[in-house]
Each structure stands twice: as structure tokens, then as C-alpha cells.
Curated annotation (Swiss-Prot):
A GO CC term assigned to this protein in UniProt: microtubule
Domain of life: Eukaryota
Residue segments, region G5 motif: 248-251
Residue ranges of the region described as G4 motif: 216-219
Region span, G3 motif: 147-150
Chief place where the protein resides: cytoplasm
Induction, as annotated: By interferons.
Region of interest: G1 motif: 41-48
Residues the record lists as binding GTP: 41-48, 147-151, 216-219
Entry keyword annotation includes Nucleotide-binding: yes
Annotated ranges, domain GED: 549-635
Protein name: Interferon-induced GTP-binding protein Mx1
Amino acid sequence: MSASLSEQYEEKVRPCIDLIDSLRALGVEKDLALPAIAVIGDQSSGKSSVLEALSGVALPRGSGIVTRCPLELKMKRSREEDFWHGKIKYKKDHDEDYEEEIQNPADVEKKIREAQDHMAGVGVGISDELISLEVTSADVPDLTLIDLPGIARVAVKGQPENIGEQIKRLIKKFITKQETINLVVVPSNVDIATTEALKMAQEVDPNGERTLGILTKPDLVDKGTEETVVSIIHNEIIYLTKGYMIVRCRGQKEIMDRVSLHEATEKEKDFFKDHPHFSTLYEEGMATIPNLAEKLTLELVHHIELSLPRLEEQIDIKLADSQAELDRYGSGPPTEPAERICFLIDKVTAFTQDTINLTTGEELKNIQHLNIFSSLRRQFALWKMHLDDSGETFKSRIEKEVNEYEEKYRGRELPGFINYKTFEVIVKDQIKQLEEPAIRRLKEISDLIRKGFIQLAQNSFLGFPNLLKMAKTKIECIKQVKESEAETMLRTQFKMELIIYTQDSMYSDTLSTLKVKEEEGERQKVGILPNSYSISCSLYNHSNNRATLEELMRHLKSYYSIASKRLADQLPLVIRYLLLQESAAQLQREMLQLMQDKNAIDHLLKEDHDIGNKRNNLQSRQKRLMEARNYLVKF
């Protein structure tokens, strides 16, 4: 690492990277994306060689898929010369963290293979569970990378047919995040435009703002194509905001000849310094592993600094969401008998108070967006609309029947007399037609109220299936009883409506108002003066029986207007009294009676296993987010 990097970043490089590593170790990545550098490349792109050169340790090699799990490679620079320490960590049995110290760098490859076999199974399968490898040495940069499986084009023996798609899904899971810098490894001796790794990076980062290209194997470039490689590194072929670097790592022959990583670094330096085409890249700081390490460290630190404000904001949002969910699930039942009784009393009391508040339109405690009165108003308005429509139909019918009156209704009375019996028959017939629609409306509203009560119970007793079942049973029973009482009351009301009665003054006022209205309508229709209209109309009407029939029509319309107003109010009043007020009061009495049976308390407070797990997970999330926020505050 250069002296300039040591001088300028010694105090903040490691703290920045340690901060993100600590957050990742807490498991915060389950909740939100953290700044990272993800390494991707096609199979045999030289990706493993680059990581080996950076970390100073041998990683799994071979043909086919070698990296079978995401590998978090945490490199920590030690000030002690000749110091080396390794540590591997991953999820083992029952989702528990397994951690093992590594004393010898030669054991790293073996330990990674063991971890991969445990996570992805022995063979060639893959897993998206992370393996964390920490390497502390004087020869490594302060840097954390995430190595992803190489992109496979064709399945080999033992691999599932869709292995290529599986790997791409895994890679996209990491590189899609805006917080990730994508390190794309491409061999220098292939057409860069055709590489799958760069295509995938361009799909998620079309402007190349968070993609850095690494060219490998420059010693295998065909003669005559060197200047094309130089143009790529100079960002003249496919533009990437973060640019390109070029490195030369150990080849297979050098590995077999046991060329050390230190020797390979010296060979790389000599290769670029002496190369007729690539020496300019070395002079510009665009070549060799040490320069790559410095660039990656600076990029990661800069990326972390830019991400911190958004990270703090996301943590606060996630904490608020977690607290809201925890409030919804509650604290869970206590273990002490006396406390369990109090817990049950509080639960039931809160629920019954909410049912009463629901029926009176007050604010609810256990659920925010439940207002039954908005639905009731719509239903009551529909009932009023039905009465009005029925009235209009009634008016049309009696106007049509006027001409049939002589044959259908007239008895022995002389012209000019209204037969009261006829009036009663027509009115009663119309009112009877309203009874069954009223009962149907009652049942619809009763079911709507029942659903509201059950929704309230589900929110109040979340995670307590026995308590919820008991509440649902009582809601259903009370609904049936109160609905039956309401139906009886309504049918009684309709029987009373068959008694033709209203206050004289009320009837006279309604009749007079209707008469004035009709006369005004007739005057406007014929366009004559009021006096001449009255005389001509009177002479005409008394010349036949028309006056009698029109008078009957007026009486029928007036009385229906009064009766329909009574019914428009009566149905809502019956519903609000019996199905709301009385039902809530009865439910409160019956739910509070549950506390009398001390033996039933344990049964009622038996918690749903999934809810308990969700609460524990939320508490764990809240704990790690709180710790994460503390890390950020102290940073």
C-alpha cells in the first residue's frame, strides 16, 4: 500500500470498513442493504486469482463451479510484521453461528471447502448463505469484498440443468442493490462486449456509475490486440464511471511451480514496467494488484461515507416499523399466574371497550382504520333510496289505475265520495311490499356488523387462537339472537303500519302541500291565470268523476310520504339499538364472564407458535437495529 494512502487514510479507512463489517456481523443486512464491493466474473475469468493476490491466501480452485456460496472476504491490515491470523464464520446446524480460528494460511482453502460442503451440500450445488472469512496480516489492504460464484453457461455432470439461472439469480441479489459496487473481472484475451458478467452489471447499472472493470491475463493477449486492451483501460470502448484496472496474477503453471504470492507480485510489477504497450498503464497507476488494492479501498471508503446518511435514515424507518409491528403483536403472556390473570383481563377489557367504541363511533385502541358507521350510512341511504323508488313506482301505479277505478274499487257510493276502505286497501298493499326488503336489508347490515366485530377480535387477540375462537363464537351467537329480536321488532312495526294512522295536523299539512304543488304544476303546464284555472278546472272536474279519483291519488301519495319517513328512520333505529348498542353490551358481559373460570385462563392464553416466533424475530431485529444505530452515532 502506498505511503500516501497510509498517511491520508490510516485514521479513517479501517474505522469506515470496520463499521460496515460490524453492521454486517450484527445481521443488519437482513433488514437493509449495506455498502459493499461484489466481485463477479465468468468461469475461468481469473476472479479467484485476483482475490488470492489481494488477500494473500489460496482460495478454492478447479474446473466448474468453485465458489459455491457468497464469500465475504474481510481483510485487515496489521501493523505487526510477520503476523497472520484467520477466522471463518458461517451458519451451521439449527441456524446457529459457527466460528473457527485459522492459524495457518495454508488451511484456508480446506476450511472454505468444508464450509461450502456444509452450506450447499457435497458436490456442485450452490447456496445464497454467506461464508465470512477474516484475514489479518501485514500484507493485505484494509478492504472487504464479497466473492460471488462464477457465471456458468452449461451444466456439467451432477449439476441441475438450471444451474446457470440459479447462479445469475444469486448474483443479481447482490449486484442489484444501489449500495453495492460491482467489481467485474474480465480476461484481457476475450471480447469484453460479449462477457456475461459485464452484461449483468450493465443491466442493473446501465450508466456504469457503480461498476469497476478488472482485466486479467494480459500475458495471454494476442499480438496486435494490445492497443485495444489499452483503449479499454482508458475507458474508450465501454465507458464505466469508475473506470478500469489491469492485473497479472499467478497462472496455473506458476501455482504448480509453487511461486509465492509475494514473488508473483514482483513478477507482475516487472511485467507491466517492461511491457512495450502496458508500461504506460503502470505509470498511470492503472495496473498491478497493489494499485488495485489502493483504488478499491478508496472507492469503498468513499462509497461508505456517501451511504451513511441514508443508512441512518433507513435504520430509523426500520426501527419505527419494527416497533409498530411489535405493538401489534403485544408483549406476549407472562408466566406468573397472577400476572396472567391481569394480562387476560387487560386483553378482554381492551377488546370489549373497543366494541363499544366501534358502535358509538369513538376512537379504537387495537385497530385504527375501522369505522363501521361509514358502511352503515351507505346501507341506511340505500334503504331510504329503496323507499323513494318504491314511492315513485307507487305513484305511477295509482295514476295508471285511476282509469280503472270505476271497475276495480268503486262501490255503491255516489260520484264525489272517496271510499276510505279503498284507500286503506291500496295503502296496506303498498306497505306490505316493503316488509321483506326491510328484513333483507336488516340481515345484510347484521352480517356487516358481525364482520366488524370479528375483525376487531382478530386484531385484539392476535396470536391467541383459543381466545379468538371464544370471541368469534360469542359474536356469532349474539348476532343470531339480536338479529332475531330485530327482525321481530321490524315485523311488529310493519304490522303497526297496517293500522292507518298519523296525526291530523301532520296529515293535513302534507295533503295541503301536495295539493298546492300539483296545482302549481298544472298552471305551469297549461299556462293560464290562477283564477281562470280554478273556475275551468272546477267546472270540468264536477262534470265527471275525475275529481274524486284525483283526490284519492292525492291522499294516497300524502299518506305514503308520511309512512315512508317513519320506516326510513325505524330500520336504522332498530339496528343501532339491537345490533350495535345491545350486541356490544351483551358481548362485553359475556367476555368478562370468562374471567370467572380460573381453570380456563391457561387455555385461553395459549399463544400461537408462529406469533411467538415473529415477536422474537422482531425483538431480535429491533435489538440489532438499535445496536447499529449506536455504532453510527459513535462513528
